[in-house]
A protein has these predicted regions:
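A short acidic, amphipathic alpha-helical/loop segment
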Residues: 93-100
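Acidic-basic catalytic patches of nuclease active cores, encompassing PD-(D/E)XK
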Residues: 1-57
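Short glycine/proline-enriched coil/turn segments at helix->beta-strand junctions
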Residues: 45-46, 101-106
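Helix-adjacent hinge/juxtasegments
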Residues: 50, 55-72
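Hydrophobic beta-strand segments of well-ordered beta-sheets in folded domains
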Residues: 80-82, 104-111
Length: 152
């Protein structure tokens, strides 16, 4: 698949995520929600989903990485899709996706936060931003919510 395939995958996942919503989840619950939502999207698109997949080679920093999700189409056709789901702007996550793209995978980075992304995103990776709202309760718990149409 060409770069158009990468754009198509990103558009499709964004559209799926824009139909999702949740309220009052903890940070770990939000990450689990998005990981499960991506897995549901992938299954709906005909992909087999693997979680926590080790990259076959070390990154430039000589670290072996694990991708949050890796998708393989059930037909056996097309390229693998590698996905990272993060709240923060982790250079390590981006490095893993760059390596996956160098291996020929489509690379998607789902980042959930309202804070801006401060790293330059290479042309081989597509960033999907989920605009998650955060509030602090009287007990100082930080709870997160997502409304429909807040993923771009």
């Amino acid at each position: 698949m060409t770069e158009a395939g990468l754009d198509a995958a990103a558009r499709s996942l964004r559209a799926w995520l824009n139909r999702q919503q949740f309220s009052d989840l903890s940070a770990s619950e939000v990450t689990a929600f998005f990981t499960d939502a991506v897995a549901d999207w992938a299954t709906d698109q005909g992909y087999e989903v693997q979680r926590e997949v080790t990259l076959p080679t070390a990154t430039r920093q000589n670290r072996t990485g694990r991708l949050d999700l890796q998708l393989r189409h059930r037909s056996g056709k097309g390229r693998l899709i590698s996905i990272e789901v993060d709240r923060g702007t982790k250079e390590w996550s981006l490095d893993k996706l760059v390596q996956a793209a160098e291996l020929g995978h489509l690379a998607l980075w789902l980042r959930w936060s309202r804070a801006p992304v401060t790293l330059p995103i290479p042309p081989t990776v597509r960033l999907i931003r989920a605009q998650v709202l955060r509030r602090t309760t009287l007990a100082r718990a930080k709870l997160h919510s997502l409304r429909p149409d807040n993923c771009g």
